[in-house]
Curated annotation (Swiss-Prot):
Gene3D superfamilies: Translational regulator CsrA. GO terms for cellular component: cytosol. InterPro entries: CsrA, CsrA_sf. This is Translational regulator CsrA. Its main location: cytoplasm. Homodimer; the beta-strands of each monomer intercalate to form a hydrophobic core, while the alpha-helices form wings that extend away from the core. The gene is csrA.
Length: 62
């Protein structure tokens, strides 16, 4: 795992198309902005796991 330190207003670039910017920090909460192409799906981890669990419970059609 790559670990980085960023300040408010600083960004992290992933590839050529994805930019993650630190918007604010309050206590133990960090607000991030994600700028990515519309074809890139972005979810919070807990939402991703909910979607995956729902998809795993859907029976495959024959």
């Amino acid at each position: 795992m790559l670990v980085l330190t960023r300040k408010v207003g600083e960004s992290l670039l992933i590839g050529d198309d994805i930019e993650i910017t630190v918007l604010s920090v309050r206590g133990n909460q960090v607000k991030l902005g994600v700028n990515a192409p519309k074809n890139i799906v972005v979810h919070r981890e807990e939402i991703y796991h909910q979607i995956k669990a729902l998809a795993d419970n859907i029976p495959e059609s024959v």
